[in-house]
Swiss-Prot record:
Gene Ontology biological process terms from the UniProt entry: inositol catabolic process
UniProt name for this protein: 5-dehydro-2-deoxygluconokinase
Gene3D superfamilies: 3.40.1190.20, putative 5-dehydro-2- deoxygluconokinase
Recorded metabolic or biological pathway in which this protein acts: Polyol metabolism; myo-inositol degradation into acetyl-CoA; acetyl-CoA from myo-inositol: step 5/7
Database matches in InterPro entries: Carboh/pur_kinase_PfkB_CS, DKG_kinase_firmi, Myo_inos_IolC, Myo_inos_IolC-like_sf, PfkB_Carbo_kinase, PfkB_dom, Ribokinase-like
Amino acid sequence: MTKIALQQDRPLDAIVLGRAGVDLYAREANTDMADISGFNKFVGGSAANIAVAISKLGGKVGFIGCVADDAFGGYVRGYMTEQGINLDGMMTDNSGSRTSVAFTEMKPNDCTVLIYRNKASDLTLKPEQVDPAYIAQSKMLVVTGTALSESPSREATLIAMEHARRSNTVVVLDVDYRPYSWRTDVDASIYYGIAAGLSDIVIGNREEFDMMETVLAPGNTDDDATADRFLRANTQVVIVKAGELGSKVYCKDGHKFQQGIFRVEVKKPFGSGDSFAGGLIWTLVNGGELEDGVKHGSAAAAINVSGNSCTEAMPTKEVLFDFIETREQDL
């Protein structure tokens, strides 16, 4: 069994860096966007989702990001505060940017999502707004990759990772690749490559690793070869998610294992990755083993996709353990 070495004497379990915005979910299931009568409002964005996931499990979480000086920005701040998330690293931008908004259908697949990110406030985060002392208060820094897509957020993200390395804060990169945020895969692969080299743990699906290997290994689809390529520099663990096939986990010491999924009735195809990361990270910061973390993440992902939102469908510790116990009894 594998454990990740952490600085346990810190007030925060994890700080998550990236976007926090608003998700508007269709009220009607299995309905096309044009026919939806209305939407329900929730906080969303990959980084916010992960932060909420860890917090709902009982973790002490901080956040680095930026929202606009608008009503949606205030809503995001208020909700995250209610969830017990420390917002000392959350900035407010008043330059005319806007908190990002996503409209989505509620379908198990072929689900249309409309995302409004012109002049997105989360991408206005500046390097000088990242406090190394804040990062040094946390066991982990969790970076979501969309923060790398544009300056000055790109530089702020990379300097946050550098600060984390200097303070012995474990760095996790959740690739979170959104093609619409990048000019080309080549551009994306360059900056993701830099970020991966600064990370202790890299989490992505096969398509995301394909992007990261655009220059170094174009056309490679072999997970073992991918892991060998990324288990260099600082990286200790590579996790390749494969949807219904589960996850493959590779460690620098040569240990590797697989984790299957927990099958549920899927209501929506998104939120699973963020819930997976939350379950994994919460387990690791509490001294749990990597194998248990991946299992907890897989269960949390299943719970989330069977719910009606992302943040509100993140499980508590009790819900998570009850779900796993029930499923394992059924085997």
